[in-house]
Each structure stands twice: as C-alpha cells, then as structure tokens.
Amino acid sequence: MKICVLFGGPHKNGNTAKLLAKVLDGAKSQGHSVELFHLVDMDIRPCKGCMACKKPKANGCVQKDDMVKIYEPLRQCDLLILASPMYWWNLAGPLKDAVDRFFAMPFAAGREQSIFAGKKLMLVMTSGQAAEHDGREGLELILQKMCQFTGMTWLGTVTAGTNDKSLDEQPQVLEKAYAIGAGL
C-alpha cells in the first residue's frame, strides 16, 4: 500500500512527530511505502478562492508553489494520513492550507471523477489535553464529511493527550500507535 503523509506540525521531533513515527514504523513493518511531506518546510500558500481551477480546460491550481509536489503523490496513494497537533480544535495552519488546496483537484464523488475515491483517510493527532477530553469530535466530523463527499473511507484517529506526560512517558500509547500502523 502507498501511504501519503501530510505532516502539519511545527516540531519534527515533537509529540505529533513521535506518534506519527510509530504509526509509520508499524506500516513499514508490513511492507507499505510511505511518502512524508513536512509542510512547515514547504511554500504552500492558502487557497485564493479564485475558482480558476474549476474553469473549463483548467489544469489545477494557478498558484505554482510547493503544493505541485504533493498533487501526484495524492493521486497515487492508497491511504492519506493527516498528522497535526490540535490547534484551536482544528488542524495546524500549514496542514489546513494544504487540505484547502485539494479543491484544485477533481474531488467530488459522483459529480466528477474524484481522485480520492477508493482511498482511505486517517488522522494522527496530539493535543495538550487528555485524549478523552481533547475535543477532536468536531474535527473528526469535518473529516468524515470530507470522506463522504470525496468517496474516501474514514479510518479514524490515532490520538494522544500530552497535558501531563510527554509521549516518551506513555509507552503504551506508542505501542498502540505501532500496532495500528502494522494493522493497516
């Protein structure tokens, strides 16, 4: 299976990165390939809402930034993983900008040939709250709606709360993340 990962966190060695690494280690142990994009290191501008990408004979987004490096891996992947710390009950800004730019691709199942149809979507998320109180329900609902609209299958969220303990102090959470990755 081909896995495309959009990592929106600002810290390459932070809690979200550690949780994601365990999921990906598990996936790689089963022979899955991974392409990881560290969005904070890329020049990805927000969607301008210009609608140029939806005009007849349009060829994607008119903004020629680093998002062009992501479009083809998105087309080719079987699983898309969005990885982010929770910021104000949402994705971190760089990841939200990239997801908004999906608009330039054929995405609406039933209305056009969705490049997302048949793919799977997973969220890997950390927050400063205990996992049972992290408030992710609203974000999960948005991603579930995105799956319905695009023809993707929602796999759920791998999450960890880090309010009182870093992930290094929660080996059981990291073991579970590895097992989830190995089960993909």
Each language-model region and where it sits:
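Short, glycine-/small-residue-rich phosphate/pyrophosphate-handling segment
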Residues: 94, 107-155
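N-terminal beta1-alpha1-beta2 submodule of the flavodoxin-like/Rossmannoid cofactor-binding fold
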Residues: 1-83, 87-104, 108-112, 162-184
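Beta-strand-loop-alpha "switch" segments that mediate conformational coupling across diverse proteins
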Residues: 156-160
